[in-house]
């Protein structure tokens, strides 16, 4: 244990920082970020796949949300699908917040960005937690909000139809469709 502490205190990390102004950017990164902290190829691949998956999930409900807001037709939509999708993506948003905030370097990352300081984008926590977490927060929050918008429209139409003693489809045909100014709705 004492040997490890001596190696840390005598590491070239601290001496490299004092000579940082005289070095090129590439050498500076190699000296300041030890090889043990750099992201592995598998970490980067996992991050890329999770970001792609997050973007696809985030955009999956958007077309239906736009169509529902334009046409107000919710009769053929599944209430349970949008409820479960909204809840699941809300929890994934919380998971993204956890990924970003759980690592001790997260606070220093935010402070360094605010102060315009150099960010070590090759570190494991950036590839494994930060990038994935930021995309999860943005993407899944979008998906959750759009799912709950469609769910709200569906429940609203169901309640109004029930008050009038109609099915949701009849309510749409008699109360909503005649007043829509959407091309193809009438």
Swiss-Prot record:
Q: Where in the cell is it found?
A: Cell membrane
User: Which domain of life does the UniProt lineage start with?
Assistant: Bacteria
Mode of membrane association: Multi-pass membrane protein
Q: Which GO terms describe its cellular component?
A: plasma membrane
Name any one Pfam family assigned in the record.
PQ-loop
Q: Which UniProt keywords apply?
A: Cell membrane, Membrane, Transmembrane, Transmembrane helix
Principal location: membrane
Disulfide bridge partners, by residue number:
none
Write out the coiled-coil annotation as residue ranges.
none
Where are the membrane-spanning stretches? 42-62, 80-100, 131-151
Membership in a protein family:
To U.parvum UU008, UU041 and UU042.
State what protein this is by name.
Answer: Uncharacterized protein UU007
Phylogenetic placement of the source organism: Bacteria, Bacillati, Mycoplasmatota, Mycoplasmoidales, Mycoplasmoidaceae
């Amino acid at each position: 244990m004492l040997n490890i502490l001596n190696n840390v205190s005598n590491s070239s990390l601290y001496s490299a920082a004092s000579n940082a102004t005289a070095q090129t950017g590439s050498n500076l990164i190699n000296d300041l970020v030890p090889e043990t902290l750099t992201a592995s190829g598998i970490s980067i691949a996992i991050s890329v796949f999770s970001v792609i998956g997050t973007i696809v999930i985030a955009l999956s409900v958007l077309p239906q949300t736009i169509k529902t807001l334009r046409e107000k037709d919710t009769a053929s939509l599944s209430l349970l699908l949008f409820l479960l999708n909204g809840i699941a993506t809300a929890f994934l948003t919380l998971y993204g917040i956890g990924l970003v905030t759980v690592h001790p370097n997260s606070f220093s990352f935010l402070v360094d960005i605010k102060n315009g300081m150099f960010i070590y984008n090759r570190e494991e926590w950036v590839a494994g937690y930060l990038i994935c977490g930021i995309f999860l927060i943005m993407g899944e929050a979008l998906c959750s909000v759009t799912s709950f918008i469609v769910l709200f429209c569906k429940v609203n139409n169901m309640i109004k139809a029930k008050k009038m003693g109609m099915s949701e489809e009849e309510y749409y045909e008699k109360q909503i469709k005649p007043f829509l100014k959407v091309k193809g709705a009438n």
